[in-house]
Amino acid sequence: MTSEQIVYLDENDLIKFCGGKKFKTILADPPWQFQNRTGKVAPEHKRLSRYSTMTLEEIKALPVESVADDNSHLYLWVPNALLPEGLEVMKAWGFQYKGNIVWEKVRKDGFPDGRGVGFYFRNVTELLLFGTKGKNVRTLQPGRSQVNLIRSMKREHSRKPDEIIGLIEKCSNAPFLELFARGERNNWTLWGDQANIDYEPDWDTYANATKAKERKKTKE
């Protein structure tokens, strides 16, 4: 089974795309706006312009609750500086916060990757908030022994580790929906303007990024 794909248009487009289908598990990586929190390193800053961002109110307005099953799980990526906003979004989408998974970004040698940014501290972690909707919505049996930490190398800006997918598939029920997805994936429904097989970053980035090594070989 191949992934379903669509180009992101607006919030109503999500309902049309899902066509009445309800999802037991939703993974979302919204294009957050940092505004004054990180200044020139924010993704919406004109110097970077890596992808379009959305305001908090625009993200909250997405009809995620309408495409979520009555008994479902939500996994929501949020930068450390925007934790309060992430909790707002989770509530607006009809989910109750239950916990989180921490992504520790590491170098090849396994030590923390200090190339991150941050106004008060140099961030080497990112949070994946976990919330539930409905009744009898505990994680599946493997989830009850799963630690809430993953360690992996960074890829291109904002790209999340693939390791999280296997974790989610073990801990939560299908059908699976990913919002603001990149690339393609079997057994998931993918929604986003970068959800296609040809996706790769078009800016200089880390060596571990999607197809970065292939581009390097081409230049040589």
Which residues does each predicted region cover?
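Class I S-adenosyl-L-methionine-dependent methyltransferase catalytic core
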Residues: 1-220
